[in-house]
Amino acid sequence: MEIGIAHYLTVSAILFTLGVFGIFLNRKNVIVILMSIELILLSVNLNFVAFSSQLGDLVGQVFALFVLTVAAAEAAIGLAILVVFFRNRGSIAVEDVNVMKG
């Protein structure tokens, strides 16, 4: 049995749906929102790699590496901002972050 593109797209759709539901169902915890965004980016990368291997082109795989790099930087910067915010405010709830408007 061969794993076709439909299998990859199904897994990618499930990951994307989990990420979107994670954002909409849990709006109070910033860390869960960041993890949900990472799930969405992972599903996009899986689509890039699946279509790239299906079409025999390496552009999708190279673009997936760029997206992974940007996602890692986004996660590192987001977590660093959350650590500083937690040290200053004592909480990382989304309601407290919205108060920080400058």
UniProtKB/Swiss-Prot annotation:
Alphabetically, which GO biological process terms does the record hold?
ATP synthesis coupled electron transport
| Topological category with respect to the lipid bilayer | Multi-pass membrane protein
Tell me, in a sentence or two, what this protein's role is: NDH-1 shuttles electrons from NADH, via FMN and iron-sulfur (Fe-S) centers, to quinones in the respiratory chain. The immediate electron acceptor for the enzyme in this species is believed to be ubiquinone. Couples the redox reaction to proton translocation (for every two electrons transferred, four hydrogen ions are translocated across the cytoplasmic membrane), and thus conserves the redox energy in a proton gradient.
Q: What InterPro entries does the record point to?
A: NADH_UbQ_OxRdtase_chain4L/K, NUOK/Mnh_C1-like
Instruction: Tell me where the transmembrane regions lie.
Output: 5-25, 31-51, 66-86
GO molecular function annotations of the record: NADH:ubiquinone reductase (non-electrogenic) activity; quinone binding
| Family that this chain belongs to | Belongs to the complex I subunit 4L family.
Question: This protein is called what?
Answer: NADH-quinone oxidoreductase subunit K
Q: Which reaction does it catalyse?
A: a quinone + NADH + 5 H(+)(in) = a quinol + NAD(+) + 4 H(+)(out)
Record gene name: nuoK
Key word Iron-sulfur present: no
